[in-house]
Amino acid sequence: MGNRLIRSYLPNTVMSIEDKQNKYNETIEDSKICNKVYIKQSGKIDKQELTRIKKLGFFYSQKSDHEIERMLFSMPNGTFLLTDDATNENIFIVQKDLENGSLNIAKLEFKGKALYINGKDYYSLENYLKTFEDFYKYPLIYNKNK
């Protein structure tokens, strides 16, 4: 790869205000590709919403409705990376905000070093997640599956 830079990815550099604004605008667009699921303050999820979760190809789709509710409600508010239980190949990003009663789920796919989120190409997982974290004002929390 040599000294070539891929697009504008510069690790360990401080972004300008203009770049941050551009990233913020991109993130607003990116958030639209997430599958939003509404949850009640009690942690209960409507049957229609549970059906939608199962149709996402979500890795918990084989679990019972109660297990899905318990798993999602037990997480604190924040942004998570979750791996597929069975294969550890699929990675999902989950953003939970109980105050607003919402849950965003998007599937991440890696092809070589490129990152695809719900089929859309991103040049850097690190940049995407940092932007996501800044936008939602939540720290990233990585799950421990093993």
Curated annotation (Swiss-Prot):
Record keywords, A-Z: Early protein
InterPro entries according to UniProt: SH2_dom_sf (IPR036860)
Keyword RNA-binding set for record: no
Alphabetized SUPFAM superfamilies for the sequence: SH2 domain (SSF55550)
Up-regulation conditions: Expressed in the early phase of the viral replicative cycle.
Function comment: Plays a role in virus cell tropism, and may be required for efficient virus replication in macrophages.
Family designation: Belongs to the asfivirus MGF 100 family.
Protein name: Protein MGF 100-3L
Species of provenance: African swine fever virus (strain Badajoz 1971 Vero-adapted) (Ba71V)
